[in-house]
């Protein structure tokens, strides 16, 4: 026996492997269990292709043994095992992967579909040195008579020698480090810790992972006393729920899995279970919660799906699998097609992941579309909870996703107590109606009281009520729907008149030009114009906006954190040409006209939901007029 150096013999490289690539020391167990599963897969594959191998699937298992006194963890499998040469190649060369080579060599074998070798890079084994200062590997290759022992204490090298081992397989012993001021290594010798780590990372490895577990049970001979019982238990569930056929799974199984996996007390609102084959093959189990997570609206909330590779947890929250507008979706994806980086924790942003993300996005949209069509009550409940995310999705990224989301939007409306889709609105439009009308406000009740609403409804036109801050921004990204443009009824250029009505109102404005100019001057730059209008029904006055920034946009933009209150809509004060107040204004003195004008302006601001610029001045003027 002689000591050998690693072929990638740099201590710096090994230090990088165990200190930089992996951010959580606990994943060493996941890596070793995955390696053991790979080894069993290889022998199981051999049993499928070689009749001389008399082994059945139920013969395979992975053992974990803990010894607190010697501070060791032992992971044993009865898989394919390794020869001295394979130990040299697989463990003596950092980043050499036997599993990857095995997959490559058997890529064309149809029976290779019956196994699922996890490893792609030969780095996982070296994560052992994050928790152990010495690692011992005893392995006997299937069909060989001689076993070999590989021993290393880290970057200084390793030894290989012959040894005794009765059966084929591999036994890895980790000599756990002593605790330090900053690190508790002893916890990895506790059965509770190991049990939890297996359930967290390796619950769906398809071979039994067994360990002796001790439990305190009542002593039947002495009341009040307990005795310790030790028995071998299987720690993993082995069969992932998402790998089963949907027809075999009861709704309560989906619900219980969700509540246990994602720590929710309520059943999910909707379950999406899909298997996709094609450019990328994957299983996905997705949940739409009934209620938003408690931290959903906080900066700390992290979106993402759990990502598995052949049943092994690779990433707890893979944000790249979900667009922001579906950030509320919980669930997981399991695929063997993903290209893994040298650490399973650092998934490459590769082409396969993008294909999967695109397929998931499409699947969720299709499910929501079906829900909207077939279960309206359920969809309205969903939209009330998460509809805001879809609206932001329309607005975000310059409207890149608007076409895929626009038919999922719901809005309150003047025509019904129930919310409507854009498609439904257009389907109800009057023959004479060319545009989609909307108004913005704090809630539907306040919007319904806007002066402009009356005239639009008198025409037989429906008005969409935009009650979320993002609504108008999203609609401006859409620009039009089914060839119909969106029109804000609170803009000064709202056109509901025929030619004769337009001619009449133009003449009235021309005749009252001197009065209107005085009123504009009285407002001292607060408005860009004062004009008479025929679109207010029975109401005396309103504020409208001209240009891009609407009244609602002004409120929203100036309410944002850090806003400098500099965003202003170009306001227009509109006076009802048919209201008696016009005659009052025409007969007023210059001083009274100024007071009337400011009162009307302040009243119009209140009606529009804007703050008064000078409440005291308004109150004094009102009292004076009384």
Model-derived regions, located:
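GHKL (Bergerat-fold) ATPase N-terminal catalytic module, capturing the glycine-rich phosphate-binding loop
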Residues: 1-188, 196, 430
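GHKL/Bergerat-fold ATPase module in large chromosome/replication-associated machines
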Residues: 117, 135-157, 177-187, 192-626
